[in-house]
């Protein structure tokens, strides 16, 4: 049997399996020796035991712990076991732990909080019988049970004293937001029973925004003084037509006002065709807008925005509907086509092209599609014969990292060599290593370009790109003193790499040291000092900033180095402060 294998063979098995050994170790009599050998953490070991419900192994560990026959690293940890047993819903293990003295109230009543969060009703009932505190941590158990829809647990917690008004009435808000109608009625009745004043308008907005029709109807019927304004706008933006119609049936007057129009535009952008159609046919009435508004410009802008937002959404039926209402789509150099192309909505592009009666600048549309990585539209335009040789589409695709489009355009005659240096440098800034490598594979890059790219990549915190450029021969010495501030301001890992490759940092601007201290970046400060950066003094305002922000570790470090404080005179020269850092920190 597996358990009888000599531990030498187990060692070979472990070496072969790597990180996937823990479950196999659980069947070995050498479990504890091998777990220590593999450097498996106590938490990882216990997690595997409890998640799989191996209570006998847990009992065995406890027995060895009591007898002092087990490594301190993996001896019985009752609290950790309780936390994990609660998380994974192992009631039998929880009962075993409690019988052996584990406190169910550990970590601010963590067990009942997590059992409520994950919906373990049997565990919650057991913990309540064992006298846990269901209200701990701002009634966390009630809030999480509500959010996750565990109504039976919610009722049980409330019966045991959990506060339905906790955290500014969070439970009923969560029930409205996530659509639990039974819970909403339950909490609402609790409020009414004690004549509790609460924000009904907010509850209606939460339910409306989520499209929870039953809850909306319930709240409206139970209130005599509810306001619909915020909820109405939210319903339109989210596209909940049934709730919108219900509001209107209750006497809500929408009107053709700016808020309604803005909400309609948002509905267009989200593709809610049914809501847009209903509003335009019944409320906004584009045909009659001129009768209500003297400002033609405002009407024209609204119509254009309807079209552009619809193009963003990609909803062809809605676009056709708007056109049927007489809205013009040929404006601002075919902006609707360009927007559709930028979002890779090929079906809209084809439709708009098919109905266009004005000249279309296909080359500009190709550039926009390439810039935004819209390969379907790019291929369509190239198939239509759009010129790729004499425009900047390949440049736009390259600097934005869209290698697939770069290759496609190049294969169809686009001139990459014309822009390859500029693309190379831009990609160094943005970390588009795939494009950089492709350019290197095709062209001989001048050493000065490599060096310039290294500076750009270093300043923009692109570690992978920096490593590649150094590997390809970029010279670390090309990084000058005036480049240092931006580079040092980036991640420490990048700085360490550059130093390991020969970057010399003997001194830096004092204001950069101050910035590092005020940002509480102690690791970076220590590293710079280890490189020999002079930090015998700092400005008083920098030190005071550490005090104000309570950066204790930074303060302790500065004091331990006996850093001198300096201040600036009115003339702008630096003077030593009469107080040293220790005196200042005491003050």
Swiss-Prot record:
SMART domains: ANK. Keywords: ANK repeat, Repeat. Gene3D superfamilies: Ankyrin repeat-containing domain (1.25.40.20). ANK repeats lie at residues 77-106, 108-136, 137-166, 168-196, 199-228, 230-256, 259-288, 302-331, 333-360, 361-390, 392-418, 420-448, 449-478, 480-507, 509-537, 539-567. InterPro entries: Ankyrin_rpt (IPR002110), Ankyrin_rpt-contain_sf (IPR036770). It holds the Pfam family Ank_2. PANTHER family: ANKYRIN REPEAT PROTEIN, GH09064P. This is Putative ankyrin repeat protein L66.
